[in-house]
Each structure stands twice: as structure tokens, then as C-alpha cells.
Amino acid sequence: MKKTKVINSDISRVIAQMGHFDKLSIGDAGMPVPRTTEKIDLAVTNGVPSFMEVLNNVLEELAVQRIYLAEEIKTENPDMLAAIETRLPETPISFIPHTEMKQELNNCHAFIRTGEMTPYANILLESNVVF
């Protein structure tokens, strides 16, 4: 059995396959995902697992150089924005319109669906190198 923090086989596989500048997305239960993007559905019920639980788990194994958030999170979900900024204090943030965020899912290795039920709780993680 795997000893590291990420034990979900699909998430582990996707992270292992990622290279520099590749993207992985984590989001709320309502985010529409293109059919061409792999969806790893972890949602069980309202709030389970939470967005932050999944983000914290993924960050145990994924080196991230930049994150992308919806511009709308600033006004529609400031508590989530604060939690993300606290978790990734040194990581540059690019704010983009939510419509662009949905389009960017076409360029992601995968989308991890959580049970999060708060607005604009979606993130694009741009991978870094570990050397």
C-alpha cells in the first residue's frame, strides 16, 4: 500500500504524469467539466470532501508555481480566497474571469470534483519542477 499522503490512485497517477507548466484543477460540485477532460469525482455529499481538504492533500505531492482563480471569488467567496492565500502564501495568483476558467479546463490533465458547495471554489494549479 502506498505510504504517501495521496492514496487516491487516479489523483496519484495524474500528478505523476504532470510536467512543468501542466495544469490540474480542483473544484466545487457544480463546475461543468468538458467531456475531453478527465474528471476524478470525489464528491460524496454536500461539503464532503471539502475543497480545502482536497487541495491540502494534492499540495502534499504536487509542486505548484502559479495558481489561477476566478476573479469573482474576491466578492462572492472571500473566505475561500483567504483560505487559499493562507495555504499558498508564496505562490503567485492570476485572477481570470470564471468563463475563462471553465474554458481552461480543456487544457488540464484532470479536474478533481469535490463536495464543496460554495461559489467559485475552483482552482487551476500550474505545476513546477522540483529541482
UniProtKB/Swiss-Prot annotation:
Pfam families: RbsD_FucU
Disulfide topology: none
Recorded metabolic or biological pathway in which this protein acts: Carbohydrate metabolism; D-ribose degradation; D-ribose 5-phosphate from beta-D-ribopyranose: step 1/2
InterPro entries noted in UniProt: D-ribose_pyranase, RbsD-like_sf, RbsD_FucU
Binding, substrate: 28, 98, 120-122
Protein's cellular compartments: Cytoplasm
Enzyme class: isomerase
GO term, biological process aspect, one: D-ribose catabolic process
Catalytic residues identified in the record: 20
Lineage top rank: taxon: Bacteria
Enzyme Commission numbers on file: 5.4.99.62
GO cellular component: cytosol
Swiss-Prot/TrEMBL catalytic activity: beta-D-ribopyranose = beta-D-ribofuranose
Assigned keywords, A-Z: Carbohydrate metabolism, Cytoplasm, Isomerase
GO MF annotations in UniProt: D-ribose pyranase activity; intramolecular lyase activity; monosaccharide binding
Family: Belongs to the RbsD / FucU family. RbsD subfamily.
Cross-referenced HAMAP family: D_rib_pyranase
Role noted for this protein: Catalyzes the interconversion of beta-pyran and beta-furan forms of D-ribose.
NCBIfam families per record: PRK11797.1
Assembly and oligomerization: Homodecamer.
Record-given protein name: D-ribose pyranase
Organism: Enterococcus faecalis (strain ATCC 700802 / V583)
Gene that encodes the chain: rbsD
